[in-house]
């Protein structure tokens, strides 16, 4: 049994995740040892959890466009890790999905990150990921954090969620696709080459 398999077993047997495990729901993340780019988001949505495949929706199509990669590279190259702040769908709230459960990322991310020694860039998708990884260096709102993305390179790059629901935000912030996405595609191409 590999170290990652031991971690997965520990996640599934953890009392915090017992209800999911009893209902046959496995933790949803990807952590290939060869990963060079780590994508940290909030948590799987209900459709994602049911489909058992992360970023396999309209948001994922847009994310791969932003990265400048195809599905084959994204899912099967071993160069992308997907490590949400919670590996399970946290449930529905009044205005959307509930936030990731407290303490989940703190408990499991450090163990899993040790298993991926080649990660060169971590993409922080959305405010929860940015607050968790950037801490006090994150700005008061997502727009300011994303706008100052160069301050966090080369280790981190904050992104707005690629959801079609963010179309208005993208229209209000043309610099995102004009500058940040151009830089992101260059960085990703450099990391993936060879």
What annotation goes with each model-predicted range?
Residues 1-59, 189-194:
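Active-site and ligand/interface coordination hotspots across diverse enzymes
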Residues 2-9, 13-21, 86-194:
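Glycine/proline-rich loop-helix segments at beta-alpha junctions forming the active-site rim
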Residues 24-33, 61-74, 113-114, 148-150:
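Short amphipathic alpha-helices and their capping/turn segments at secondary-structure boundaries
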Residues 39, 80-82, 156-158:
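Conserved beta-strand scaffold positions in the cores of enzyme catalytic domains, especially
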Residues 45, 68, 161-164:
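Residue-level marker of positions within ordered structural domains that often coincide
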Residues 45, 49, 64, 130:
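Short, electropositive, low-hydrophobicity segments enriched in small/polar residues
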Residues 53-100:
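Short, surface-exposed acidic-centric catalytic microdomains
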């Amino acid at each position: 049994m590999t170290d990652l398999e031991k971690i997965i077993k520990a996640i599934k047997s953890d009392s915090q995740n017992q209800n999911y495990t009893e209902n046959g729901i496995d933790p949803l993340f990807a952590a290939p040892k060869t990963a060079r780019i780590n994508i940290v988001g909030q948590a799987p949505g209900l459709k994602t959890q049911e489909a058992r495949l992360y970023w396999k929706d309209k948001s994922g199509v847009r994310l791969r466009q932003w990265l400048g990669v195809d599905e084959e590279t994204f899912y099967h190259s071993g160069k992308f890790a997907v490590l949400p702040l919670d590996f399970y769908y946290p449930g529905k709230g009044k205005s959307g999905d509930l936030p990731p459960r407290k303490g989940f990322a703190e408990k499991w991310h450090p163990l899993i990150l040790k298993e991926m020694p080649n990660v060169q860039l971590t993409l922080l998708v959305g405010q929860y990921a940015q607050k968790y990884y950037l801490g006090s260096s994150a700005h008061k709102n997502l727009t300011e954090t994303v706008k100052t993305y160069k301050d966090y390179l080369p280790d981190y790059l904050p992104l707005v969620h690629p959801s079609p629901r963010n179309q208005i935000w993208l229209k209000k912030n043309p610099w995102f696709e004009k500058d940040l996405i151009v830089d992101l595609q260059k960085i990703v191409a450099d990391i993936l080459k060879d």
